[in-house]
Each structure stands twice: as structure tokens, then as C-alpha cells.
Amino acid sequence: MANEVISGEQLQKVIRDAADLVVSSAGVTLGPEGRPVIMSKSYGGPEVTKDGYKVINNLKPEDEKIAKIVELLNQATSQANEKAGDGTTTATILVGNMIKNAHKHIAAQRSRTKLKSGMKRARDEVVKYIQSVAKKINSEEEIAQVGSISANGNSEIGNKIAEAMNKVGKEGVITVEEGKGLDEFSVSVVQGMVFDRGYVSPYFITNPEKMIVEFDNPYVLLANKKLSSIQPMVPLLETIVRSNRAVVIIAEDVEGEALTSLVLSKMRGSLKACAVKAPGFGDRRSEMLEDIRILTGAKTLVSDDLGVTVESLTVEDLGTAKSIIISKDSTTIVDGGGEKTSIDARVKQIKTQIDKTTSDYDKEKLQERLAKLAGGVAVLKVGGATEVEVKERKDRVEDALHATRAAVEEGIVPGGGATLLSAIAVLEKLSSDDDDEQAGINIVKSALKAPISQIVENAGEDASVITYNLLESKDPNRIFDARELKYVDAFKAGIIDPAKVVRVALESAVSVASVLVTTEALIVDLPTKDNGSPSMMPGGGMGGMGGF
């Protein structure tokens, strides 16, 4: 396939156009007076959203060159969403402004390496500042307040999040599910576990928006060995297909033909499945698989030591769970099908091992297993009058939960873009003997005004006047309330942001902007002419797999 190489001023224009497109599309959603965006969908009616992350992920520019840069810019939002669960629109506005500021320096033939160096020095200083002004939160009341603010002032959501954290601990596992009742909004603690292994392949993803696999009422197949061949699994998988249920395979590894066949079957829609590597190594992996077996109620697991093969299994031997959520880094089992008496006995056994061991390392690992098995999972159930309302409320609760977790982790700072604005004073004191590196520092310094300027403009006010007044006040807690259109104390007014969200937004923006600043060329494929030849896509079932 032929391709085209773009460089120089032509590339710089493509980068600017892509940045302008992303900022103009998502920027209007920022802040309390942010405006909604209507997005067309490939199925169903259009979707109305104020979620900047959704907007950016739905951008599909016709120009292939701009599309490639938009894809790269999306990494800033994805990083922010993945690490902090929020701050995606702020990251977008920051990176767009940095690119705009960098262009004039690139045109002036400044050293791109030095620009990048200056940007990173500025980033490090601002991160230190954010951490220094962050206020830690500890009480259930403070957690409820942060949750309420994160949910646009909804105190009920804040109180439920605080209740859930109180039940399973600040580090505990909390999930959000769709409830059945019209006004249902409840918190319950069920048997469950989370471990730090994710899907083996991203092709298993069922929710592309969140980049996760979600299954309700799946089977759980456990194997303390590598699974490489699909043939021994076919009879069992065919039975699972007929039951119209999903299966999560947790094994030492799933590779080769087995992995390929599972992925292809999932992509064809014939089998709902996901493969996950088992947590731990050696004997610890065996023990953790046994924990999962007891939690899910599986009768046995595939193991050479036990003489149990995949061929010998039936669905009655498999474990179950009410739901399983799998990301690229973790797996959460909610309400496993195991008997409470069996789980309690296993917990008691682990406690005995903790008391008997003389190794600090072994004790630590046993305590980790105990926490995973005994801690349980808090489930927030959210109901509504319609499917659309339930989904919207569920998304809102999930966003508030992410933000609250981030706040508990690193504290809170003045919101509304004020913390980044006040960090300008820190960069005023940062200088470099190298003019090009100083230009890089100035790129970040100028961008720090962008988020609050966008928030103010969305409220219909003059951003230059507001930012000037805030900078002149030299009070980091003084912010502009874009809803009430007045200056207030951030903490008294409850307009705060999780420090982690602000930090990650800045770090993600500098990361992506510095890549684009130093990029010299872009290679894109040229469109091929359709010669009318028939499609070569394979059809039908796969030999030896029973057509599942």
C-alpha cells in the first residue's frame, strides 16, 4: 500500500488543525456552565453529552492526516482517564494550548529538544506545587462532601460513596451496578475479590468506551497450567455457548491456538469469553487459584498435580459469579458463587498460617490474600425510570467514585482551574540560562491559564479580566465560581478538585505535547482504489471448533 510523508510546515499545520478540532469540540463541555454536545451514533438516535472524554473519543476526522494526530492527542485524555478517572477535558485543553504556543517557537527554529526539556522542568515544578497545596481528607463527612461535589452537587451520591468506603475501607473494592427499582440507590457488601491481572488480549473487550470486559453471571474456568490447544476445550465451550452465558478463563497462561480461537470466536459473536493470567507465581499462584475456586464455588480446577484435565470438566465443575469486570491491569469478581461456610473456613485457614509463619515476607503475602478474600466488595446499585436514565446515573456515580478515590489518595486542591493558574507564580521563579529551554518553560506557563479561561468563557464572562484579578489577589484559595459568577473561597464554597486529577491532567498533557513538539514527520497510507473485487473475509465456522 502506498503512503504519504508529511513534514515541515505542512506537518505543523496538521498538528495545529487537529489540536484546534479537539479543543473546540471538547472545551465547550468544561465547567458548571459547559454546554452539551450532540453526537451521532452508528445505531439508535443521537447522544447528548457533557462528557469531554466521550466527545474526544467520538471524533472521526475525514482527513487521514488530522485523524492520526487526533488519535495521538486522545492519548492525553486516555492517560488522564485511566490514571485518575477524570480530568480528561482539562488535559485536552492543556495539550492544545501547549501545541499552539510551541508552534511559534518551532517556526523560529528553536531547538525542539530544549523546548521539550523546558516543558518537563516546568511540569515537575508544577507537580511539586500541586502536592504542596493539597489538603488531605480523612473523615466520612469529608469524603461525602468530595463525592457530592464530584457529582455536581448531588449529596445523595456523595453520602452513598462515603458509606461504601466506610464499609470496605478506603482501599476496598467498590463497583457500580444497574439496579432494578425506579428510585433504587443502595449500598451492599457481597463476597468478592480483586487481583492485579487483566485480560490477555484487548480483543476480549466488551465495553470499548471504558476499555474493560464486563460479564453478568459468567462461568469461571480455573487452570493451574498453560492452555495452548483449543481442541480439549471444545465440548465444554459448546455447552457454555448453548447456555448463552459467558466464561472467564483464569489460567497460568492462555496462548497459541487456544488464545487465537477464543479471540476469533468472541469477535464473531459466537462465544462470550475472556482469558486472564492467574495472579502470583509458583506455589502462591496455586494458593490464589484455590482462593478463587472457593470464592466462585468451582468444584475443581485443571491441574496436572491433581490429574484434572480440561476434557474431564463439565459446566457443573465451573465456578460462577454475579458479575466479573476485567481491565487491562485487574480483575474484579463480584458476588462469587461459593458457599459462605467454605469461604469462612478458608479465611480461618489463612489466619492460622499467618500466626504460624516466621517469615515476614510470607506473612505479608498471606495478609494480602486474607484481605482479598475476606474484604468483600461494596456494590452501589443505581436505578431509574428508563434504561437511558439508569445509564446516565450509573455513569455519574462512577465518575464521582473515581474522583473521590483520587481525592482520598492525594488530597484536594482549589477547583475551577484555579490551582493550575496559581502555579504560574512558581514558574515565574523558574528560569534557564538557555533561551530555548526557557521557551519550553514558558509554553507550559502560558498553558496553565487555559483551563480556567475555558471555564470562564463557557460561563459567558471575560476570561482575561477574571484571570488577571485572580493572579493579582495572590490567594491560592480564591477562585471564580462560574455558576454564581462571583469570587469565593474554594474550600468554603466546596469548589475543589482531587489533587491527583489535576496532577495527572498536567502530566498527560506535557507527555503528549512534548512528543508532538519533537515530531518531524507523519506517514499516512494513501486511500486505495476500489476495483470491485469480492471480499476475502472468511465466513462460516472454524473447522474442529464445532462452529461456536
Curated annotation (Swiss-Prot):
<keyword id="KW-0963">Cytoplasm</keyword>
<feature type="binding site">
    <location>
        <position position="416"/>
    </location>
    <ligand>
        <name>ATP</name>
    </ligand>
</feature>
<feature type="binding site">
    <location>
        <begin position="86"/>
        <end position="90"/>
    </location>
    <ligand>
        <name>ATP</name>
    </ligand>
</feature>
<comment type="similarity">
    <text>Belongs to the chaperonin (HSP60) family.</text>
</comment>
<keyword id="KW-0143">Chaperone</keyword>
<dbReference type="GO" id="GO:0051082">
    <property type="term" value="F:unfolded protein binding"/>
</dbReference>
<dbReference type="GO" id="GO:0016853">
    <property type="term" value="F:isomerase activity"/>
</dbReference>
<dbReference type="GO" id="GO:0042026">
    <property type="term" value="P:protein refolding"/>
</dbReference>
<dbReference type="Pfam" id="PF00118">
    <property type="entry name" value="Cpn60_TCP1"/>
</dbReference>
<dbReference type="GO" id="GO:0005737">
    <property type="term" value="C:cytoplasm"/>
</dbReference>
<feature type="binding site">
    <location>
        <position position="50"/>
    </location>
    <ligand>
        <name>ATP</name>
    </ligand>
</feature>
<dbReference type="InterPro" id="IPR018370">
    <property type="entry name" value="Chaperonin_Cpn60_CS"/>
</dbReference>
<comment type="function">
    <text>Together with its co-chaperonin GroES, plays an essential role in assisting protein folding. The GroEL-GroES system forms a nano-cage that allows encapsulation of the non-native substrate proteins and provides a physical environment optimized to promote and accelerate protein folding.</text>
</comment>
<feature type="binding site">
    <location>
        <begin position="29"/>
        <end position="32"/>
    </location>
    <ligand>
        <name>ATP</name>
    </ligand>
</feature>
<keyword id="KW-0067">ATP-binding</keyword>
<dbReference type="InterPro" id="IPR027413">
    <property type="entry name" value="GROEL-like_equatorial_sf"/>
</dbReference>
<dbReference type="InterPro" id="IPR027409">
    <property type="entry name" value="GroEL-like_apical_dom_sf"/>
</dbReference>
<protein>
    <recommendedName>
        <fullName>Chaperonin GroEL</fullName>
        <ecNumber>5.6.1.7</ecNumber>
    </recommendedName>
</protein>
<dbReference type="InterPro" id="IPR001844">
    <property type="entry name" value="Cpn60/GroEL"/>
</dbReference>
<dbReference type="GO" id="GO:0140662">
    <property type="term" value="F:ATP-dependent protein folding chaperone"/>
</dbReference>
<comment type="subunit">
    <text>Forms a cylinder of 14 subunits composed of two heptameric rings stacked back-to-back. Interacts with the co-chaperonin GroES.</text>
</comment>
<keyword id="KW-0413">Isomerase</keyword>
<keyword id="KW-0547">Nucleotide-binding</keyword>
<feature type="binding site">
    <location>
        <position position="497"/>
    </location>
    <ligand>
        <name>ATP</name>
    </ligand>
</feature>
<dbReference type="InterPro" id="IPR027410">
    <property type="entry name" value="TCP-1-like_intermed_sf"/>
</dbReference>
<dbReference type="InterPro" id="IPR002423">
    <property type="entry name" value="Cpn60/GroEL/TCP-1"/>
</dbReference>
<dbReference type="GO" id="GO:0005524">
    <property type="term" value="F:ATP binding"/>
</dbReference>
